[in-house]
């Protein structure tokens, strides 16, 4: 969660090769970096937070995530990936507001339920295990998964890496709310 500024976004797009790709293929990249404070009507833990505008002004939301373990919540897949909708430096703020694993996991489910992705795709071709999100080791898995349900996809993902889905607090929370398997 670094700064959510036009300069930062342009540098990221340039570094990833997206600027050249956009020029070649004739599409635009969003660099305005606007966000809005939103109310999450069905939330149990976090009723208000900021969300980047592209997540709010959309026709369709595809959640493209990597299969990986995570130091705080145990697993990072489709549900955790949507934390990317929270603008840059507001992410550490939410970590401070919800420092316990249970509370943070509940906030992630609140956000996922609000954003309601239309399609989730999990890239597990080269997964990551260890102390994620950045401290893990690459692991060749050779799998790709997709689902309309971020919760169902994450249950499959946890099973693939040998975790019991009920041991992942956000998946247990989603199940208790009737959102996932």
Model-derived segments and spans:
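N-terminal and secondary-structure boundary signal
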Residues: 1-181
């Amino acid at each position: 969660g670094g700064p959510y500024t036009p300069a930062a976004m342009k540098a990221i797009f340039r570094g990833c090769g997206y600027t050249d790709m956009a020029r070649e293929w004739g599409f635009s990249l969003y660099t305005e970096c606007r966000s809005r404070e939103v109310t999450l009507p069905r939330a149990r833990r976090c009723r208000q937070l900021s969300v980047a505008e592209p997540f709010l002004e959309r026709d369709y939301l595809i959640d493209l995530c990597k299969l990986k373990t995570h130091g705080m919540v145990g697993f990072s897949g489709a549900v955790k990936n949507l934390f990317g909708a929270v603008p840059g430096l507001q992410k550490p703020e939410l970590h401070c507001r919800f420092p316990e694993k249970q509370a943070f996991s509940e906030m992630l489910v609140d956000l996922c339920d609000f954003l309601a992705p239309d399609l989730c795709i999990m890239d597990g071709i080269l997964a990551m295990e260890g102390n994620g999100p950045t401290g893990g080791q690459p692991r060749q898995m050779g799998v790709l998964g997709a689902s309309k349900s971020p919760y169902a996809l994450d249950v499959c993902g946890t099973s693939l890496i040998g975790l019991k889905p009920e041991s992942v607090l956000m998946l247990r929370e989603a199940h208790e709310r009737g959102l996932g398997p």
